[in-house]
A protein has these predicted regions:
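A short, small-residue-rich loop immediately preceding and capping a beta-strand
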Residues: 103-139
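ATP/NTP phosphate-donor binding region
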Residues: 2-109
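Active-site segments that bind and position negatively charged phosphate/pyrophosphate groups
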Residues: 219-370, 375-385
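C-terminal charged capping/lid subdomain of soluble metabolic enzymes
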Residues: 2-17, 309-452
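A glycine/threonine-rich phosphate-anchoring loop and its flanking beta-alpha core
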Residues: 128-226
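Generic secondary-structure signature for well-ordered alpha-helical cores
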Residues: 73-77, 101-104, 157, 168, ...
Length: 452
């Protein structure tokens, strides 16, 4: 039996941490249990709201929204609703605009009935409107329920906008357990991605001095451990296992809200996912669930970390390497296409690839290399273990299974780091001149696996 999470330990108060910062979240209520839908009216009233605005899509309304509305009717709570008709919802300007236009100004709180995309849309729109929002979760598919950021696609670029956390997360375990298994395995993939993102965060702390909190890292590790332990029961849709996994996803989100950004839960594995998502959207392809892509990205990043452990560097020679900005810019334009201006603007601002900055990082990398090797060994399970775990649950473990070609794998490894100003393994590989080589290696690795 997995260790139980008591999420109430993190709610309603601030914590002075050994990292020197005060941690707190504005999340007030978490109710993930049997028949939680019947308690939705009570939670709305407890928070002092009179008229919620329910936001769903055709799938989540059928799965949970209609039942939630029925409970509100019985309780005598007036509400308005907006149901997206699109079967594949894209969180872009058009979708956000349609939601803002449909909003009823006599409502005093927004309730997202759904998971990832609906949560991001409601998180951002409520923040812009100066309203609070709640989540009635329909699937344990990702860990962004209570993160402070809203992931949207603007000007063709996947961008995280500062927003706020919901005041409540409600999840009925019967509804959560009945969700398509693909969405459950997506949640597992999102959580397993924490193995690599936490290592990226620690590496950034060692090499760049970026803020790092071991307490928050331990919170995320606890979430990962629970999901791994529950993975055998989750395949059978065991309600207790679904509850544990959903609470682990919420815990990961609380960790993000403590930091104020997604650093404890998003690293190079997410950047690969973002790149594939942007390419799929540009080409008009059906979106792949976020956590499914993250799980595959995690395998790729773990494999690259394993390979990095065996490298030996001539740091003096590395510092002499030049950077062909024109070639980089051409590659960005060729691959990112309509999103390229935003990517180039980010580099002009962040200067991630500035040679003076690179050489300062290389000097620290040389000095800290033994510590970095120890950190890698202590932090990661093997890529083979992760492949077996995901495969046992029926989750994709190879990019080819989700329609990502070898070329797209290679391009993602080379260019995904440009999506964010965030130091990860991909920047280490660029700094050390290994990025193109590792891109080919990972593409070949998955290509061979796909042909077996």
């Amino acid at each position: 039996m997995a260790k139980k999470i008591n999420l109430n330990d993190y709610l309603g108060h601030s914590m002075d941490c050994t990292c020197g910062k005060e941690h707190k979240t504005n999340l007030k209520i978490v109710d993930i249990d049997k028949d939680a839908v019947s308690r939705l009216p009570k939670h709305i009233e407890a928070l002092g709201y009179k008229k919620p605005f329910l936001v769903a899509d055709v799938n989540t309304w059928a799965a949970a929204g209609a039942l939630a509305a029925e409970k509100l009717d019985v309780a005598g709570i007036s509400y308005k609703k907006y149901i997206f008709n699109e079967k594949e919802l894209i969180p872009d300007e058009k979708t956000l605009g349609s939601l803002m236009m449909a909003f009823s100004r006599d409502c005093d709180v927004i309730v997202a009935v759904g998971s990832g995309t609906l949560n991001d849309l409601c998180k951002f729109s409520s923040f812009q409107l100066g309203l609070d929002y709640m989540v009635f979760a329909t699937a344990p598919s990702m860990d962004g329920f209570v993160s402070i950021g809203a992931a949207l696609i603007t000007n063709y670029v996947k961008t995280t906008y500062q927003a706020h956390v919901p005041l409540a997360v409600i999840g009925d375990t019967d509804i959560l357990a009945a969700t398509p298994m693909e969405m459950i395995t997506a949640g597992l993939g999102d959580i397993l991605g924490k193995y690599t993102c936490l290592l990226d965060w620690k590496m950034a702390h060692i090499i760049t001095g970026e803020y790092y909190c071991s307490h928050i890292a331990d919170m995320v590790k606890e979430a990962v451990e629970i999901v791994v332990e529950e993975s055998t029961r989750i395949k059978d849709r065991n309600p207790d296992a679904v509850k544990a996994v959903t609470e682990a996803l919420v815990l990961s989100g609380i960790a993000m809200s403590f930091v104020g950004n997604s650093r404890p839960a998003s690293g190079s594995e997410h950047h690969l996912s973002h790149y594939w998502e942007m390419k799929f959207q540009a080409e008009g392809k059906k979106p792949i669930l976020h956590g499914i892509k993250v799980g595959i990205g995690m395998i790729a990043v773990t494999k690259m970390y394993e390979t990095l452990e065996n490298e030996q560097f001539d740091f003096a020679s590395l510092k002499e390497r030049s950077f062909d900005y024109a070639a980089w810019e051409k590659k960005v334009k060729d691959c990112y296409q309509d999103a390229a201006p935003g990517i180039i603007a980010l580099e002009e601002k962040a200067q991630k690839n500035n040679l003076d900055k690179r050489n300062k990082r290389l000097a620290i990398l040389e000095k800290k290399w033994p510590e970095i090797l120890r950190t890698i060994k202590e932090s990661l399970p093997s890529s083979a273990e992760m492949e077996k775990l995901l495969a046992r649950l029926g989750a994709p473990i190879n990019p080819a299974q989700i329609g990502v070609s070898s070329e797209l794998v290679e391009d993602a490894v080379i260019l995904a780091k440009e999506v964010r100003d965030r130091f990860t393994l991909l920047q280490v590989l660029w700094d050390t001149g290994l990025l193109d080589e590792y891109a080919k290696m990972i593409a070949a690795y998955f290509g061979e696996k796909a042909n077996c």
